[in-house]
């Protein structure tokens, strides 16, 4: 795998250079990361069959990065689980899905996963176990490394059936994305050694942007721990101490930072590049960033988890940001072709909106253990005389005359909120499982062209015993046991019934038009 070879070369030539640094103080150099992942990979190879998923559990811990690399070296896909944002029942659901032929899944746990209730049987390596294995040393056989169509990682995303679905990204997808990622980094004005901001949870595919780019280029991941991100003052101090040169985040995170007047070039004098992905970049956010960071450039990108993070990019100029038109998300990367199709799957003319179809060498293998779902949205094609996979995104977009993609939103029940992809059907399914709920639907509320919050429309199964406000609070507390925080509706509206259309279907448009 080229990605591992890149890191190996850096570890050999610049072994004492920091590879991962966390805002709370922990740090590992390249030689420490390489040696530790070698030793852990040897253990995994001796105890886990090649190709069997291994869970890596924690939050912004350097040993999670060690775990990712160790899995790749051992020939096993890693499954990242953020211990802060992913609730217990969701962890249990993911664990059940990756259980291999009745065996207990191996978990590399940098935090205590034994506190998670309702978990199936696990083989857990605690932090103490991991340290013991690393101290013992060792390395796997080189032929255990993943390559080609081997699965590199599995990211579980929102699923409409009420259970998360695992997106399988191959080693070749990862390598192809990484090569493009390194090209994008050149916008920062240097070849390597840059410090990359690592803010998104590792269970969110945006984090692969910096995992790939930083380590393959000899740079450093500067990880913002949960404890840092929950305090505005601590976060500002951490950013000031980071010396970050390449910023990777959702636009929403940057927008939160912009609320502080101190967030400007003087705070981050080395910052030269903003890379945004995961949701729509508002013109005002781009404009304010370019004003406050005159030495930095802004890249807007687009891509679902199923196409390895991102497949398009474009630089946003001050003139574009100051305009009234929504910002484009750019042209496709090498090895990728975009099509816009109508409801019948026929190509749309330039300037016409339709469904975005991605064809290329970073399209995922499919959904883990779900051939039924895979066959619905994945296919095959040929790009640059090479056979590739295709993915129907469910996104609405348009290609202009210059080949630039313009993204307008989701065609189905999927929405993006603060950069997180959410399947409204999954929230509805969890609501319906509650005994106090007879029927439920979830809609997204919009403000200034993007999703501001979620609204749950609930038909109660019994008369309300408290005020609607207090009943709504209790309902949201119940949901927190099964859903991540970003999927919890902000508002709960109790109704006698849900509106229907003339053909007997739920009138989602009517619900969405309700003011909340």
Question: Each predicted region: which residue ranges?
Answer:
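AMP-binding/adenylate-forming domain of the ANL superfamily
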Residues: 1-154, 169, 176, 282-286, ...
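AMP-dependent adenylate-forming
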Residues: 2-4, 100-144, 174, 297-300, ...
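Acidic-histidine catalytic/liganding microenvironments
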Residues: 14, 260, 293, 371, ...
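Glycine-rich Rossmann NAD(P)(H)-binding loop
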Residues: 21-24, 275-277, 418
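Short loop/turn motifs at secondary-structure junctions
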Residues: 50, 103, 243, 267-270, ...
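Receiver (REC) domain switch-region micro-motif
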Residues: 54, 107-108, 196, 247, ...
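Substrate-binding/gating loop at the entrance of the active-site cleft, primarily
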Residues: 58-62, 204, 489
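Motif- and composition-driven signal specific to adenylation
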Residues: 63, 68, 76-95, 137-347, ...
């Amino acid at each position: 795998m080229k990605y591992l070879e890149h890191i190996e070369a850096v570890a050999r030539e610049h072994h004492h250079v920091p590879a991962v640094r966390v805002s709370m103080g922990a740090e590992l150099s390249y030689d420490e990361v390489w040696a530790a992942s070698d030793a852990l990979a040897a253990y995994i190879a001796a105890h886990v069959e090649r190709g069997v998923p291994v869970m890596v559990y924690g939050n912004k811990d350097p040993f999670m990065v060690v775990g990712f690399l160790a899995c790749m070296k051992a020939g096993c896909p890693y499954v990242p689980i953020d211990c802060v944002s992913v609730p217990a029942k969701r962890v249990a659901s993911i664990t059940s899905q990756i259980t291999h032929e009745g065996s207990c899944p191996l978990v590399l746990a940098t935090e205590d996963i034994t506190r998670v209730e309702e978990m199936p049987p696990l083989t857990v390596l605690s932090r103490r176990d991991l340290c013991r294995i690393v101290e013992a040393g060792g390395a796997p056989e080189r032929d255990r490394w993943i390559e080609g169509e081997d699965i590199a990682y599995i990211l579980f995303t929102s699923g409409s059936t009420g259970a998360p679905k695992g997106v399988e990204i191959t080693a070749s997808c990862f390598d192809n994305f990484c090569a493009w990622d390194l090209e994008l980094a050149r916008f920062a004005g240097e070849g390597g050694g840059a410090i990359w901001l690592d803010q998104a949870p590792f269970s969110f595919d945006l984090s692969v942007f910096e995992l790939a780019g930083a380590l393959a280029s000899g740079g450093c991941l500067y990880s913002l721990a949960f404890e840092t991100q929950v305090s505005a003052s601590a976060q500002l101090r951490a950013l000031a101490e980071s010396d970050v040169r390449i910023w990777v985040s959702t636009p929403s995170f940057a927008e939160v930072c912009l609320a502080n007047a101190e967030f400007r070039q003087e705070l981050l004098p080395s910052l030269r590049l903003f890379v945004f992905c995961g949701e729509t970049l508002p013109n005002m956010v781009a404009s304010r960033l370019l004003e406050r960071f005159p030495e930095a450039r802004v890249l807007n990108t687009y891509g679902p988890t199923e196409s390895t993070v991102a497949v398009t990019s474009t630089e946003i100029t001050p003139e574009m940001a100051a305009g009234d038109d929504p910002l484009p998300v750019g042209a496709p990367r090498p090895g990728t072709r975009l099509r816009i199709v109508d409801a019948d799957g026929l190509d749309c003319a330039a300037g016409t909106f339709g469904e975005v179809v991605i064809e290329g060498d970073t399209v995922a293998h499919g959904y883990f253990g779900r051939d039924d779902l895979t066959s619905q949205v994945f296919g095959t094609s040929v790009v640059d005389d090479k056979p590739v996979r295709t993915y129907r995104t469910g996104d609405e977009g348009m290609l202009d005359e210059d080949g630039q993609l313009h993204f307008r939103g989701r065609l189905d029940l999927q929405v993006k909120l603060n950069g997180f992809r959410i399947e409204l059907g999954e929230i509805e399914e969890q609501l319906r499982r509650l005994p106090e709920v007879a029927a439920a639907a979830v809609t997204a509320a919009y403000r200034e062209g993007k999703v501001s919050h979620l609204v749950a429309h609930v038909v109660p199964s019994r008369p309300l015993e408290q005020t609607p406000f207090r009943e709504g609070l209790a309902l949201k507390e119940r949901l927190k046991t099964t859903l991540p925080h970003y999927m919890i509706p902000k508002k709960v509206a109790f109704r006698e019934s849900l509106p229907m259309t003339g053909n007997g279907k739920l009138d989602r448009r009517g619900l969405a038009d309700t003011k909340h």
